[in-house]
Regions:
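Terminal connector regions
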Residues: 362-363, 403-449, 502-516
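Intrinsically disordered, low-complexity Pro/Gly/Ser/Thr-rich segments with frequent PxxP/GP/PP motifs
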Residues: 378, 382-418, 478-504
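Active-site-adjacent substrate/metal-binding segments within catalytic domains
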Residues: 1-65, 73-96, 233-272
Length: 516
């Protein structure tokens, strides 16, 4: 989801917009939703999307509010619609017109207080009246579709987001239309809940993280650098969300005591792992779920938020993760272990023997051609020693399809010291890989990986002496872009990473081992 690039719009520029959209493509995004709570972007935005092949989901500029349709206001809106439809309609990147952001849903439920999994007990945000409902129907289900049909008949009109097709017909039905899924995050459910849903299309979902330390330093004095300080909480769009980040963090990682920088790093891993958990699940179920748009791409000021790129253009861990989990050909793993246990804190004799541990690999292919790949996996311990070699299998995945491999039971795996490494190769080149734990990261017994690196030209070579999870490689200004970052590394492996932009000065690294 694309939001305004700056709170002061004249500070944006075509060059800045191009860079942002190029970075979206670099992370394998193929669609950008122009959010209805922002503004209609400049012509330059659409020109760049045409050039880069990005499909635009274009909201009309209405979000999260009711509008009273006086004759004068309706006349003003009609002029606005005519102007923007005529301006945008000729762009090859335009894929969809959407009437508004979340207004059908809010009207249907009578405000946030009455939405599912938001039992606040507060009164609705507004009292629905027949006139308000009539105004909604007239604007989004009569005026707008009629105007789009007259001025841009070849482009599809969708009445709202989320929606099941309009007419207040259960706009959040996961079996039809699109869904904004916020039970994870706003509803405080664990991110493992993503696997309980197979939506048709997820047009908005997200998970917050703090920006990097250099960005925090841009709006704080040293005495403000505590996430519960006045300044840090005011640089937070979502009320009390710094506390929410810490609640989720405590469910997943150990408490970071090594300083604010480590806490910020941990929050970014939390966000990235949560989104990976959801997207990979939906990609494995291609055919049922046909798309996911991450909330959000960018920020309009330096802030803790759902973005994958912060205000200054620094990539968070999520953006690097997106590059991997949105890759055209993806190998992913549906594991069973501690997170799948319906009662992981139950009294039992031995958690290792009483918990089912298994993996089931899946290759998803978003290209227009069949893809033949070789899949390999190993069960390894925290020293990267191979405990069980899964061998290799060659499979062909049809175009725009997925292929499941057989489930493998791993009763011998120690959930506190073992992990599975899996990789996908094509023509001898590794094109997708990751690792999976059977416990939450805070319970895994990491060994100091003794990370080291050297620079050769425009490349960095990173190595480890033990299994390293989510290796972060930053320069002094924390502003470079690498070909890969926040990756898993096995002992003895050398990871060669190209420097896309930025200087290799003051390189520092860490992994989940350092969250302590």
């Amino acid at each position: 989801d694309y939001i305004p690039e700056d709170n002061i719009l004249p500070r944006t520029s075509p060059e800045r917009t191009r860079k942002l959209l190029e970075q979206a493509v670099a992370a394998n995004h193929n669609c950008v939703r122009v959010w209805g709570g922002g503004h209609y972007p400049s012509d330059a935005f659409y020109d760049v999307c045409d050039e880069l092949g990005l499909v635009i989901w274009q909201d009309f500029m209405f979000a999260c509010a009711h509008y009273n349709l006086s004759d004068e206001f309706e006349e003003n809106l009609r002029a606005e619609f005519n102007d923007n439809i005529k301006r945008i309609r000729s762009h090859a990147s335009l894929g969809l017109w959407c009437g508004n952001n979340e207004m059908e849903m809010f009207t249907f439920f009578g405000g946030l207080a009455l939405m599912p999994n938001n039992p606040t007990g507060d009164p609705p945000m507004w009292e629905l009246t027949p006139k308000q409902k009539g105004n909604y129907t007239r604007l989004y289900e009569y005026i707008l579709p009629k105007t789009v049909k007259a001025l841009d008949p070849q482009t599809y009109y969708w009445p709202s987001s989320p929606s099941s097709g309009g007419d207040f017909d259960d706009p959040s039905d996961e079996t039809r239309g699109d869904v904004h899924y916020w039970d994870v995050w706003h509803g405080s459910l664990p991110f493992t809940d993503y696997r309980n849903h197979n939506f048709r299309y997820v047009s908005e979902f997200g998970f917050q993280a703090f920006p990097t330390l250099k960005t925090v330093e841009s709006f704080t004095e040293p005495e403000d650098r505590n996430i519960f300080s006045y300044v840090m909480e005011k640089h937070q769009r979502n009320n009390a969300a710094n506390s929410k980040i810490m609640t989720y963090l405590g469910q997943t990682y150990r408490y970071p005591t090594a300083g604010l920088g480590t806490l910020l790093y941990t929050s970014q891993l939390l966000s990235a792992e949560a989104m990976k958990y959801g997207v990979e699940h939906w990609r494995r179920h291609r055919g049922q779920c046909m798309g996911a748009i991450v909330w959000q791409l960018n920020d309009c000021w330096p802030v803790a938020s759902w973005s994958s790129i912060d205000y200054f253009g620094r990539w968070k861990a999520l953006h690097y993760y997106e590059k991997r989990f949105f890759a055209p050909v993806l190998l992913s793993c549906e594991e069973k272990g501690f997170l799948d246990d319906p009662n992981p804190n139950r009294e039992c004799r031995d958690l290792n023997t009483d918990t089912v541990k298994s993996i089931r690999l899946n290759v998803s292919n978003e290209t227009m051609q069949p893809q033949t790949v070789t899949v390999k996996w190993e069960l390894r311990n925290n020293r990267s020693e191979v405990l069980r070699d899964g061998g290799e299998v060659e499979i062909t995945v049809p175009a725009m399809d997925t292929v499941w491999l057989d489930t493998v039971e791993l009763p011998e795996a120690n959930m506190f010291t073992d992990h599975v490494h899996y990789a996908c190769y094509q023509n001898g080149e590794m094109i997708s890989e990751s690792t999976v734990l059977f416990s939450v990261p805070k319970y895994y017994d990491y060994i100091d990986p003794q990370l080291s690196c050297r620079v050769e030209g425009n490349e960095i070579i990173v190595s480890a002496k033990a299994y390293a999870k989510s290796v972060e490689v930053l320069n002094e200004n924390e502003d470079w872009v690498l070909e890969d970052n926040y990756f898993d590394l096995e002992a003895g492996e050398e990871r060669r990473i190209r420097i896309v932009s930025g200087d290799a000065n003051g390189i520092h690294m860490r992994s989940v081992y350092n969250i302590r």
